[in-house]
């Protein structure tokens, strides 16, 4: 599923234009028309609507037309999730999904009145939405969400993660209940979560709090799939802290196992737990560990792995296996996300592993769902191969030394990460003279005793700088 599938027809068309220009700006009118199949009149209408919507939502975003070329201009403080939300907010399908999350159920007549549409129109939207939700194996029936509970929450996690404003996250993170949950999890892991892990955890917890109001959650599938983990020592430790992990909310005894298994499923598949905790869990066996072992054996047969496998590699493989084992479907940001036909996930590798990926995954049918999750998993596996083959088991570390203030530093970090395809094996941090780096990006004169490549910025970080930085990394590692 693409995010645009949830939008109204006009907004979906506008979002398609935006998505193309985010990848290819500037583009000629003819190129955009060919890419979108819009007539010139429709394209011009949508361009006007995009600029109007940006003004209405106070987004620093505009599309300029000059000499038959379109150029997308986006302010440094404008976030992608704010843009996406602006195009979703008036969508009937999106409003319906949000209503179900926070209200749990609806009466068709009442909801149609609230949305200012007829019951027949509401029925058509529900029917269309159910066709989309089939990818995630749940549906809307009789005014309620019906399906495996872990898959419902997984879908909402993917949706809200793409549209929640910074204020939403800050508000949730500031709640005493969320802080207690984080502290409890950190205590159980014996390690602090990163800020990104905390944000993902509180979002999942927020969704959980809404779903706890539902008395008809279906846990049969997660209980069957995760039955090998109920005796796992880490799971049992989690279970003993059920009150702290669910904000003291009352959970029926018949639902305790189901609720905890859903939380456990999230923790072991979304890169929340630290490496040593995940190794501990995998050490006790279980279905995800077994699938990870199968994948490792197939990779060894292709001579991609030796006898010794580093912890970070096993960790990534376990996350990939956990996702395909427990979940189906994926909500793609746009049609270009994880698009291997036109982009590749490699930063350093000159070798293409796409064919060997097809060979390996064809032997493990669980990796071939026929959903958007296939694309995401294949992309992440190829990123891992890039890391294994070219970096000798070592993460690439980039230091930023910039006199631009906190906001400038944060923006440049986000831009650089976005350009490097959000490769999890590249870390970008504030420059520390006492640390070692593979590359330093700076707009200050730096005197170094050790030989570290330095890229000097003359002005703001632009596309030429980004291309040069990527080239320098490749040259150093290639």
Predicted regions and their residues:
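A cross-family "folded-core" feature that marks the main globular domain of proteins
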Residues: 1-478
